[in-house]
Amino acid sequence: MIKGCKICGISDPKTLTYVVDHPHPPQFVGFIVNWKASSRYVDLVRLKELLSIDKKKSKYVGVIVKNDESTLEKIKDLPFDYYQIYDCSPKEIIKIKEKYNKKIIVALTIENKEDVKKYKEYENVSEIILFDSKGYEKSMSFDHNLLDEVEDHIEKMIAGNIKIEDVTNFKNKHYILDVSGSLESSKGIKDINKIDKFLNTVHNI
C-alpha cells in the first residue's frame, strides 16, 4: 500500500493551515527555499511566517537545489524536519547532515535505469530517496516501473507529474507520493479542492 504523501511548493499561510489541519494531512509538506526561478519559491521573510504555523502531524521539508551554503546558513534555525537536496554529492550530503543535524531526502532526477542505480551512492547518507523527473518543476514524467529494481529496504518517494487520478496506480507500491503541480489551479497557486481530493484519495486506498 502507499506509505504516505508529500505536498510540495506551498507558499501561502491559508493553504498551509488547510493542509496541516486536514483530517488526513500529508506526512510531509515542502517549501522551495532557494530555487528563485520557481513560481513556488518563498523568500526568507515568508518562510519564517509559514514555518511559524504549527505543523501538527506533518513534517516540514526545505527543498534546496545544490550545496547552497548561504541558504543553509539562513535557514539553519528554522523548524525544518528534513532537507530535500538536489544535485549534491554523497560527501556534500554528509557534511550538510552533520553540520545542520537534519534528516535528508536525496532527490535524484530520473530518465533511465542508469539514473535509478545512483540511489546506491546515497542510501547510507539519507533517510529517504526521492525519484523525480528531469527538468525541475516542468511537470515531466518518467517510467515508474524503473523503480521495481530498487531494493525494498529503501524508503522511496516518487514525483514527476503525478495526478490525482494516478494515485490508484500505486496502491500496491510502498511509495511516498510527492505532488505539487497537479494540485494547482494555476502555476504556483494551490487549489484547496484538489488538495482535499488528493488527501482523501490517498487515505482511502
List the model feature ranges, each with a label.
Residues 1-205:
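Conserved N-terminal beta1-alpha1 strand-loop-helix module at the mouth
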